Amino acid sequence: MGKFEDKKQLRCSFCGKNQEQVKRLIAGPGVYICDECIELCSEIIEDEFEGNTESSPLETSNLPKPQEIKDYLDQYVVGQDRAKKSLAVAVYNHYKRINANKAEDDVELQKSNILLLGPTGSGKTLLAQTLAKMLNVPFAIADATTLTEAGYVGEDVENILLKLIQNADYDVERAEKGIIYIDEIDKIARKSENPSITRDVSGEGVQQALLKILEGTTASVPPQGGRKHPHQEFIQINTSNILFICGGAFDGIDKIIEKRGTKSSIGFGAEVKGKSEKNVGELLKDIMPGDLLKFGLIPEFVGRLPVLVTLEALDNEALVSILTKPKNALVKQYKKLFELDNVKLDFTEEALKAIADEAINRKTGARGLRAIVEETMMDIMFDIPSEENIVKATITEETIKDRKDPELEKLPEGEVRPTLKTEKKNKARKDIETA
């Protein structure tokens, strides 16, 4: 009888209910917990976990609209309005698709990866980086020229996924919603439109290797990178929801487009067209998948990049805007550098145009702007820390074109400019005195 009473007295150590008042009582070393308390603890932990994590911008309610995405891109990338619109719509649809496919539905939305085509320095990489920054998703950049087919010297395509996992701090679930930008994708084109008899390990072979991860597969990634071997553990990652953006200059594809658009005719009534009738940017707008096949991409690869976004070569006006307008514009960066030495830096309008002209002449686009400014500023940046009477430097057109010294404003001989810290203290003291 005593044993029966003892059995009835078994109680939950948390809520005090006995075993007859609950569905289940789980025993531990000297303690008991009921099913109700387990459920309550689970809810508390779940709420706390959700409270500590940022609200994901990728949920349908938080997903930025195409117009908002373009407005954000406008803050960092100058020009390329058509490309920004196309990218904004493609990215919006991609993450909307991820949320839609979570629900059980007969219709499964397929992934649309993106191919960016445009000359060097037109903003392809910056667009992809800025998108990832806005969406707060892991982002990785890979160079297609370093990739080779499995079994050959070079990087396996799985190493691209490893970079993404590393940038997500090895949070695979987060990495599975990231963005991968593969640069120089035009360099893995095969040498001709026709299939090659010989092995093309860095061209067609890489395209074949990329097919599966572009489409969506569960890939095995070596956690330390390098080649796979059978005795190591792998990280499993599903690429179905990873957005792949491939970019390339595709030098010479304009001739393929032009050839397709010009029907050759013979005789007195034949229409003769000048080669310079359309510039490269205008021709790229007319690109078709067939042009990419002629360039050397295989049909299966082109099929997995259905969204074609073209960028135009930047003109003088656009390059000047890049120098001055974005949040992190190059001119603003150099002004800040000089400000740290308490020196004011100015660029004349003619100097900015001369920098842009030089970038166009070098055919380096926006990417070459920093190199030109750095070359111009080298001597003055060398002198300023030592010459403590310089308070202002003005970069003129002659400074850029003829490498003449900038126009300098100096204090009278014997005077030294105050350090930035001293000037701030003096200003604060003056504010207090006048208060």
From Swiss-Prot:
Binding site for ATP: P119, T120, G121, S122, G123, K124, T125, L126
Region Disordered, residue ranges: 401-435
Gene Ontology cellular component annotations, sorted alphabetically: HslUV protease complex
One of the record's GO molecular function terms: unfolded protein binding
Segments traversing the membrane: none
Keywords on record: ATP-binding, Chaperone, Metal-binding, Nucleotide-binding, Zinc
Residues of the ClpX-type ZB domain: 1-53
Name recorded for this polypeptide: ATP-dependent Clp protease ATP-binding subunit ClpX
Quaternary structure, from the entry: Component of the ClpX-ClpP complex. Forms a hexameric ring that, in the presence of ATP, binds to fourteen ClpP subunits assembled into a disk-like structure with a central cavity, resembling the structure of eukaryotic proteasomes.
Superkingdom, natural source: Bacteria
InterPro entries linked: AAA+_ATPase, ATP-dep_Clp_protease_ClpX, ATPase_AAA_core, Clp_ATPase_C, Clp_protease_ATP-bd_su_ClpX, ClpX_bact, P-loop_NTPase, Znf_CppX_C4
Function comment: ATP-dependent specificity component of the Clp protease. It directs the protease to specific substrates. Can perform chaperone functions in the absence of ClpP.
Residue numbers binding Zn(2+): C12, C15, C34, C37
Coiled-coil ranges (or none): none
Family: Belongs to the ClpX chaperone family.
GO biological process, one term: proteolysis involved in protein catabolic process
Disulfide bonds: none
